[in-house]
């Protein structure tokens, strides 16, 4: 990708994030985005099929950043409390983008995609866990349950208090 294409991509992404911060995904139009990015609609369509594809691409970027922040792909298997701390530290570091990209009708996308990504990492390393019911249920419970507990309570009680409680819950699960 040459420098012009990179600048256009960045303008599209910045315009989308600015619009998405104030509007539901379903109400953003290509025309409005193109005007804000100072590009033509045709230029937008050279890069993305529609607004939803752009949104998914930005969501995927955030998800990959979160997953790559986990120091060891098999940390969930080795040390579940440490895994929880790393995962939620990454959520906190990306909170601004999470609030924009995963709000409204997109709220459930993040924990589902994070869980899928973690499963892929774990099963590549420890394939025998794929059919382990207890392991799979705990993974879903830990990722989905902890995510919703965090997102519902972190603003009220602060991320440190929520993470400390999640750490205690995780430790009791594996005691």
Give the label of every model feature segment:
Residues 29-30, 58-71:
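Short, basic, alpha-helical segments at the C-terminal edge of helix-turn-helix-like DNA-binding modules
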Residues 70-96:
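Hydrophobic alpha-helical connector segments
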Residues 21-25, 38-39, 45-56:
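HTH DNA-binding helix-turn interface
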Residues 152-175:
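C-terminal peripheral helix-coil segments that are non-catalytic and often amphipathic
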Residues 1-19, 23, 27, 36:
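Basic, helix-initiating cap at the start of DNA-binding domains
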Residues 12, 31-36, 44, 91:
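Append "Primarily bacterial transcriptional regulators
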Residues 18-25, 69-72, 94, 127:
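Basic, amphipathic alpha-helical hairpins
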Residues 105-140, 144, 171:
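Amphipathic alpha-helical packing segments from all-alpha helical-bundle domains
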């Amino acid at each position: 990708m040459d420098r012009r294409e990179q600048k256009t991509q960045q303008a599209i992404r910045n315009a989308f994030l600015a619009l998405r911060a104030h509007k539901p995904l379903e109400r953003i139009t290509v025309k409005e985005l193109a005007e804000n990015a100072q590009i033509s609609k045709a230029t937008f369509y050279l890069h993305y099929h529609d607004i939803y594809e752009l949104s998914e691409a930005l969501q995927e970027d955030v998800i990959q950043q979160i997953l790559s922040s986990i120091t060891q792909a098999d940390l969930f298997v080795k040390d579940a409390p440490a895994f929880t701390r790393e995962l939620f530290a990454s959520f906190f570091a990306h909170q601004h983008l999470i609030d924009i990209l995963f709000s409204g009708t997109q709220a459930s996308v993040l924990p589902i995609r994070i869980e899928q990504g973690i499963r892929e990492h774990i099963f590549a390393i420890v394939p025998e866990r794929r059919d382990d019911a207890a392991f799979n249920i705990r993974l879903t419970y830990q990722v989905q349950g902890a995510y919703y507990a965090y997102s519902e309570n972190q603003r009220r009680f602060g991320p440190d208090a929520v993470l400390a409680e999640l750490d205690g819950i995780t430790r009791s699960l594996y005691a």
